[in-house]
Amino acid sequence: FCVILLICAIPYTIVAQHQNILIDAVGNPEEPSIYINPTNTNQMVAGANINKVYYSQDAGKTWTKGKLESTYGVWGDPVILCDTAGAFYFFHLSYGKGSEGWLDRIVCQKMEDFADKTWSDGSYMGNSLLKDHDKEWIVNDPRNNAIYSTWTVFDKYDSKKASDSSYIYFSKSLDGGVTWT
């Protein structure tokens, strides 16, 4: 009985496999995030550390590669989102100026035209040179297109002191990522 069951299962196992597509191997991309446009499922955007962005317009069969830039700096932890209007967002850590300025805020960059692939310089939430902002995550409410973000703010990153704390922050945007409350 077990042999017959195994023989019958083999063809279905082979047919059920999906093609694994390697998007990029240069620089060992890590911490990937990917999102499919809910209004056009052929359009996909992916991000990887530190500033890599990838585009597919054929439902992930082929990809093109880009590099994200911002005057706020781009320092990894990508989170990709697409709103109900089809605009893509790339959230990431900042790389502020000065030795103590890195991770001083969470940056939101927006791409409204998939064909053009131009990203805004970005808006941001947080902004504290004395604390480290990290571990952001984003969701979109499809009923009103609001964007919600949470992230962690550390008094001192990796500190073991009892006097140093970490806090979970929350922010929302009701205007497509232009401003944050």
Please annotate each region the language model reported.
Residues 16-181:
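C-terminal PAP-associated
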